[in-house]
């Protein structure tokens, strides 16, 4: 048993029971974005959160413990993602990454955008030409220090 096994079980139960991530998030009391990342093995749950997830997905006590182990974050199965939706994000960074970097440095100076002190919001945006995906990423700016 490992964290990947627990993630696979969560996905299997989600599909078989028709569970929605937003409903899981409401029960956990956190955002749908963070909760989904946690259920997919990318975040660490505390004991209380793991018990709520365990109840929703029928996890054993051992499986709930795995949800509390710090995961290997950013662990995709291949170096370049092959899933079309995930690949589009790879493409966005490939095409616009240098632009994003330049504009952040111009606005804030030399540093990085945190993915730790971070939030994300994903919403549907109605558009007569076809609905759009609106993604807002908000990360604390962390300047490099001199020493």
From Swiss-Prot:
Enzyme class: lyase
Keywords: Lyase
Cystines in this chain: none
Swiss-Prot/TrEMBL GO biological process terms: cyanate metabolic process
EC number: 4.2.1.104
Catalytic-site annotation from UniProt: 88, 91, 114
InterPro entries recorded: Cyanase, Cyanate_lyase_C, Cyanate_lyase_C_sf, CYNS_N, Lambda_DNA-bd_dom_sf
Single GO MF descriptor: DNA binding
Pfam family, one: CYNS_N
Catalytic reaction equation(s): cyanate + hydrogencarbonate + 3 H(+) = NH4(+) + 2 CO2
Family: Belongs to the cyanase family.
Biological function: Catalyzes the reaction of cyanate with bicarbonate to produce ammonia and carbon dioxide.
Name the UniProt record assigns to this protein: Cyanate hydratase
Source species of the chain: Variovorax paradoxus (strain S110)
């Amino acid at each position: 048993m490992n964290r990947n096994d627990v993630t696979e079980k969560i996905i299997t139960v989600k599909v078989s029971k028709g569970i929605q991530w937003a409903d899981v998030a409401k029960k956990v009391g956190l955002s749908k974005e963070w909760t989904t990342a946690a259920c997919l093995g990318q975040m660490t749950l505390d004991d209380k959160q793991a018990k709520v997830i365990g109840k929703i997905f029928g996890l054993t006590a051992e499986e709930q413990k795995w949800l509390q182990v710090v995961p290997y974050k950013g662990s995709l199965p291949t170096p370049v993602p092959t899933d079309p939706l995930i690949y589009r994000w790879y493409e966005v960074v490939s095409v616009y990454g240098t632009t994003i970097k330049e504009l952040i440095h111009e606005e804030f100076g030399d540093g990085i955008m945190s993915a730790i002190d971070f939030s994300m919001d994903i919403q549907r945006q109605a558009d007569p030409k076809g609905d759009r995906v609106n993604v807002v990423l908000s990360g604390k700016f962390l300047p490099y220090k001199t020493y």
